[in-house]
Regions:
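Bacterial Sec-dependent N-terminal signal peptides
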Residues: 1-29
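Structural preference for beta-rich elements and adjacent junctions enriched in aromatics
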Residues: 22-235
Protein backbone atom coordinates (compact mmCIF):
# COMPACT_ATOMS: atom_id res chain seq x y z
CA UNK A 1 0.00 0.00 0.00
CA UNK A 2 2.77 2.48 0.92
CA UNK A 3 4.59 1.71 -2.34
CA UNK A 4 1.38 2.31 -4.32
CA UNK A 5 0.79 5.65 -2.62
CA UNK A 6 4.39 6.70 -3.23
CA UNK A 7 4.13 5.88 -6.94
CA UNK A 8 0.85 7.78 -7.12
CA UNK A 9 2.38 10.83 -5.42
CA UNK A 10 5.33 10.82 -7.83
CA UNK A 11 3.00 10.57 -10.85
CA UNK A 12 0.89 13.47 -9.58
CA UNK A 13 3.93 15.69 -9.01
CA UNK A 14 5.41 14.83 -12.40
CA UNK A 15 2.22 16.17 -14.01
CA UNK A 16 2.53 19.49 -12.20
CA UNK A 17 -0.06 18.82 -9.49
CA UNK A 18 0.44 19.13 -5.77
CA UNK A 19 -1.38 16.75 -3.45
CA UNK A 20 -2.33 18.80 -0.39
CA UNK A 21 -3.83 18.21 3.03
CA UNK A 22 -3.64 14.42 3.36
CA UNK A 23 -6.09 13.17 5.95
CA UNK A 24 -6.12 10.21 8.29
CA UNK A 25 -7.84 7.19 6.84
CA UNK A 26 -11.43 6.87 7.88
CA UNK A 27 -12.74 3.70 9.43
CA UNK A 28 -16.06 4.18 7.62
CA UNK A 29 -17.06 1.34 5.30
CA UNK A 30 -19.64 1.82 2.58
CA UNK A 31 -22.88 0.11 3.51
CA UNK A 32 -24.40 -1.21 0.30
CA UNK A 33 -27.45 -2.69 1.96
CA UNK A 34 -30.88 -1.23 1.26
CA UNK A 35 -29.56 0.94 -1.57
CA UNK A 36 -32.10 1.81 -4.27
CA UNK A 37 -31.35 0.89 -7.87
CA UNK A 38 -29.00 3.57 -9.22
CA UNK A 39 -29.86 5.96 -12.00
CA UNK A 40 -28.03 5.40 -15.28
CA UNK A 41 -26.85 7.70 -18.05
CA UNK A 42 -25.20 7.01 -21.42
CA UNK A 43 -22.05 8.97 -22.22
CA UNK A 44 -21.99 9.30 -26.00
CA UNK A 45 -18.84 9.50 -28.09
CA UNK A 46 -18.26 12.60 -30.23
CA UNK A 47 -15.87 13.71 -32.93
CA UNK A 48 -14.58 17.25 -32.59
CA UNK A 49 -16.21 19.90 -30.43
CA UNK A 50 -19.43 18.62 -28.82
CA UNK A 51 -22.75 19.81 -30.20
CA UNK A 52 -24.53 20.05 -26.86
CA UNK A 53 -27.94 20.22 -28.50
CA UNK A 54 -27.44 16.55 -29.43
CA UNK A 55 -26.14 15.30 -26.07
CA UNK A 56 -28.58 13.64 -23.61
CA UNK A 57 -29.27 15.67 -20.47
CA UNK A 58 -29.73 14.39 -16.94
CA UNK A 59 -31.54 16.23 -14.16
CA UNK A 60 -30.25 16.60 -10.61
CA UNK A 61 -33.81 16.58 -9.31
CA UNK A 62 -33.42 15.03 -5.87
CA UNK A 63 -34.04 17.89 -3.42
CA UNK A 64 -32.23 17.10 -0.20
CA UNK A 65 -32.20 18.24 3.43
CA UNK A 66 -33.66 21.72 2.78
CA UNK A 67 -37.05 22.94 1.49
CA UNK A 68 -37.44 23.29 -2.27
CA UNK A 69 -36.41 26.85 -3.22
CA UNK A 70 -36.98 26.44 -6.96
CA UNK A 71 -33.35 25.92 -7.98
CA UNK A 72 -32.78 23.24 -10.62
CA UNK A 73 -29.64 21.65 -12.05
CA UNK A 74 -28.77 19.60 -15.14
CA UNK A 75 -25.77 17.85 -16.65
CA UNK A 76 -24.51 16.59 -19.99
CA UNK A 77 -21.49 14.39 -20.66
CA UNK A 78 -19.70 13.08 -23.74
CA UNK A 79 -16.20 11.97 -24.69
CA UNK A 80 -13.69 11.48 -27.46
CA UNK A 81 -10.35 9.68 -27.53
CA UNK A 82 -8.63 12.29 -25.37
CA UNK A 83 -11.14 13.85 -22.94
CA UNK A 84 -14.38 13.57 -21.02
CA UNK A 85 -16.49 16.68 -21.73
CA UNK A 86 -18.73 18.10 -19.02
CA UNK A 87 -21.54 20.66 -19.24
CA UNK A 88 -23.41 21.55 -16.05
CA UNK A 89 -26.09 24.21 -15.71
CA UNK A 90 -28.30 25.61 -12.99
CA UNK A 91 -31.57 27.51 -13.06
CA UNK A 92 -30.92 29.93 -10.22
CA UNK A 93 -31.95 33.58 -9.99
CA UNK A 94 -29.84 34.70 -7.03
CA UNK A 95 -26.25 33.64 -7.60
CA UNK A 96 -23.43 33.83 -5.08
CA UNK A 97 -19.94 34.05 -6.58
CA UNK A 98 -17.58 35.18 -3.82
CA UNK A 99 -14.46 33.11 -4.36
CA UNK A 100 -11.77 33.53 -7.01
CA UNK A 101 -8.66 32.16 -5.28
CA UNK A 102 -7.41 28.58 -5.61
CA UNK A 103 -8.38 26.14 -2.84
CA UNK A 104 -11.40 28.24 -1.85
CA UNK A 105 -14.50 26.59 -0.32
CA UNK A 106 -16.54 26.98 -3.49
CA UNK A 107 -19.39 24.84 -2.10
CA UNK A 108 -20.40 27.92 -0.12
CA UNK A 109 -21.06 29.74 -3.42
CA UNK A 110 -23.56 28.72 -6.09
CA UNK A 111 -21.70 25.51 -6.86
CA UNK A 112 -22.04 22.76 -9.47
CA UNK A 113 -20.27 19.49 -8.72
CA UNK A 114 -19.35 16.26 -10.49
CA UNK A 115 -18.08 13.27 -8.48
CA UNK A 116 -16.92 10.16 -10.34
CA UNK A 117 -14.99 6.92 -9.92
CA UNK A 118 -14.15 4.21 -12.46
CA UNK A 119 -16.07 1.05 -11.70
CA UNK A 120 -14.21 -1.37 -9.47
CA UNK A 121 -11.80 1.26 -8.12
CA UNK A 122 -11.64 2.66 -4.62
CA UNK A 123 -10.89 6.37 -5.07
CA UNK A 124 -13.19 8.96 -6.57
CA UNK A 125 -12.68 12.51 -7.80
CA UNK A 126 -14.78 15.52 -6.87
CA UNK A 127 -14.80 18.50 -9.22
CA UNK A 128 -16.50 21.53 -7.63
CA UNK A 129 -16.86 24.79 -9.58
CA UNK A 130 -18.40 28.15 -8.70
CA UNK A 131 -19.68 30.81 -11.15
CA UNK A 132 -16.21 32.39 -11.39
CA UNK A 133 -14.75 29.18 -12.76
CA UNK A 134 -12.89 28.61 -9.49
CA UNK A 135 -12.22 24.86 -9.38
CA UNK A 136 -11.65 22.69 -6.32
CA UNK A 137 -10.56 19.07 -6.86
CA UNK A 138 -10.00 16.23 -4.45
CA UNK A 139 -9.35 12.52 -4.77
CA UNK A 140 -9.87 9.82 -2.16
CA UNK A 141 -11.96 7.02 -0.73
CA UNK A 142 -14.46 9.02 1.32
CA UNK A 143 -14.94 12.38 3.00
CA UNK A 144 -12.00 11.96 5.39
CA UNK A 145 -9.52 9.83 3.48
CA UNK A 146 -8.67 12.13 0.56
CA UNK A 147 -6.33 14.86 -0.63
CA UNK A 148 -6.67 18.13 -2.53
CA UNK A 149 -5.19 18.41 -6.03
CA UNK A 150 -3.76 21.75 -6.99
CA UNK A 151 -1.76 23.39 -9.74
CA UNK A 152 -1.60 27.06 -10.68
CA UNK A 153 -3.25 26.68 -14.10
CA UNK A 154 -6.36 24.63 -13.27
CA UNK A 155 -8.66 26.71 -15.48
CA UNK A 156 -6.40 26.22 -18.48
CA UNK A 157 -5.67 22.57 -17.70
CA UNK A 158 -9.37 21.68 -17.70
CA UNK A 159 -10.41 24.39 -20.22
CA UNK A 160 -13.07 25.80 -17.92
CA UNK A 161 -15.62 28.16 -19.44
CA UNK A 162 -18.51 29.71 -17.54
CA UNK A 163 -21.62 31.56 -18.69
CA UNK A 164 -24.26 33.44 -16.77
CA UNK A 165 -27.57 35.16 -17.54
CA UNK A 166 -30.73 36.28 -15.75
CA UNK A 167 -31.97 32.70 -15.43
CA UNK A 168 -28.88 31.06 -14.00
CA UNK A 169 -25.43 29.83 -14.88
CA UNK A 170 -23.55 27.07 -16.64
CA UNK A 171 -20.05 25.71 -16.86
CA UNK A 172 -18.18 23.74 -19.50
CA UNK A 173 -14.93 21.88 -18.94
CA UNK A 174 -13.07 18.78 -20.01
CA UNK A 175 -11.21 16.14 -18.04
CA UNK A 176 -8.26 14.77 -20.02
CA UNK A 177 -7.74 11.04 -20.19
CA UNK A 178 -4.12 11.54 -19.18
CA UNK A 179 -5.26 13.22 -15.95
CA UNK A 180 -7.33 10.20 -14.92
CA UNK A 181 -4.43 7.92 -15.86
CA UNK A 182 -2.24 9.62 -13.26
CA UNK A 183 -4.34 7.68 -10.75
CA UNK A 184 -5.51 4.74 -12.87
CA UNK A 185 -2.85 4.09 -15.54
CA UNK A 186 -4.90 1.46 -17.38
CA UNK A 187 -8.12 3.51 -17.48
CA UNK A 188 -10.01 3.69 -20.78
CA UNK A 189 -13.15 5.55 -21.78
CA UNK A 190 -15.20 2.36 -21.69
CA UNK A 191 -17.40 0.47 -19.29
CA UNK A 192 -18.92 2.31 -16.34
CA UNK A 193 -18.21 5.38 -14.26
CA UNK A 194 -19.85 5.43 -10.86
CA UNK A 195 -20.83 9.07 -10.46
CA UNK A 196 -23.16 11.72 -9.14
CA UNK A 197 -23.98 15.30 -10.07
CA UNK A 198 -24.71 17.85 -7.38
CA UNK A 199 -25.88 21.42 -6.91
CA UNK A 200 -25.33 23.23 -3.64
CA UNK A 201 -24.84 26.65 -2.11
CA UNK A 202 -24.22 26.50 1.62
CA UNK A 203 -24.00 30.28 2.10
CA UNK A 204 -26.33 31.48 -0.62
CA UNK A 205 -29.52 33.36 0.24
CA UNK A 206 -31.34 30.05 -0.17
CA UNK A 207 -29.10 27.18 0.98
CA UNK A 208 -29.85 24.09 -1.09
CA UNK A 209 -28.66 20.59 -1.96
CA UNK A 210 -29.61 18.72 -5.13
CA UNK A 211 -28.37 15.42 -6.55
CA UNK A 212 -28.85 13.34 -9.68
CA UNK A 213 -28.77 9.97 -7.92
CA UNK A 214 -30.60 9.80 -4.56
CA UNK A 215 -28.55 10.07 -1.37
CA UNK A 216 -29.44 7.92 1.61
CA UNK A 217 -27.82 10.08 4.30
CA UNK A 218 -30.05 11.88 6.79
CA UNK A 219 -27.71 14.88 6.92
CA UNK A 220 -25.88 16.82 4.19
CA UNK A 221 -23.13 14.66 2.75
CA UNK A 222 -22.16 14.42 -0.93
CA UNK A 223 -19.14 12.21 -0.20
CA UNK A 224 -21.03 8.95 -0.49
CA UNK A 225 -19.71 6.77 -3.33
CA UNK A 226 -22.18 4.11 -2.23
CA UNK A 227 -24.89 6.47 -3.53
CA UNK A 228 -23.34 7.05 -6.96
CA UNK A 229 -25.30 6.30 -10.11
CA UNK A 230 -23.95 4.64 -13.26
CA UNK A 231 -22.61 6.45 -16.32
CA UNK A 232 -22.01 4.10 -19.23
CA UNK A 233 -19.60 4.88 -22.07
CA UNK A 234 -21.17 4.20 -25.46
CA UNK A 235 -18.91 3.18 -28.34
Amino acid sequence: MKKTLLCLSLAIMSAGFMALKPANASAKAADAQNQPDPNSYSIVKVQGNPDWTLIPELSADNILWKPDCGIRAFGQFCYDDSSLYVHLRAVEKEIRASFTAPLSPVYQDSCLEFFFMPEGRDRYFNFEINPNGCLYIECGRDRRDRFVLYRSDLQERFQIRTERDENGREVYYQIPLDFIRLFYPDFQFSGILNANVYKCGDKTDHPHYLSWNPITSEKPDFHRPEDFGMMIFEN
